[in-house]
Amino acid sequence: VRRCSSSHDIENMDIEYESLSGDLMLVWANGTGSNGTNGVRYRTCPGGIPTCTWGAVTTPPTFLDDATSLDISANPSTDEIVFASIGNAGGDLQLGYWNGSIWTDTANADTSCTVPYTASKLVATGWLVGASSTRSVVVYSDLNSGNINWYTGNAGVFTRQPDFVPTPAIATSRGYMDIHMDPVDKAQLMYLTSDSLSDLYAKRLVLSGTSTLTWTNSDGVALETTLPQVISSPFSFAFWKK
């Protein structure tokens, strides 16, 4: 598998259940991937049962780069899955969409991202499901940016969104980021990130109407300013399920 400098030094694989079928999707970064060389691999385990049989290792077509730091998320209402990765060979962002049967890819969505480093996680994915529309969400670390840099996806079509400028400002170097979807109100999610100043931030994203997406500074201030480390998942979050 792909690594930064030594084995097991970065989150280079992820697994999800399809929400309707219960099929398993395992995606990882193959070590042969590089800048301009497809490094994404996947296997599925159909059936939604503990005794399911894993299919063959498959290389999804059109993916273009290594996938050193990656994340996938399942749509809570369908069999769709969203994928995002940044490679450490070239710092390129690639975005993927699984429709329940096949992967499609948007390569080089951003070619100047922060290069993944040991124990970092510089990309996060999620879904927003509203009354009349659904969007996938990808947040990533753009090079030298203190803003929240993000894409939304409508099925397999990804659109770069205007940067959200957080208050207070977040340091330009990120350590670890994650997205958590609200299991009750599926039209909102929380994005959390640590930065190089040992700060922790939480921001909320809400989908309203047909396609209105609104970020809020739900933390108001840094939740923590003295994290003991900024890498290797230095925080945890969960919605209270009523």
Each model region followed by its residue ranges:
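Extracellular, repeat-based ectodomains that mediate carbohydrate processing or recognition
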Residues: 1-242
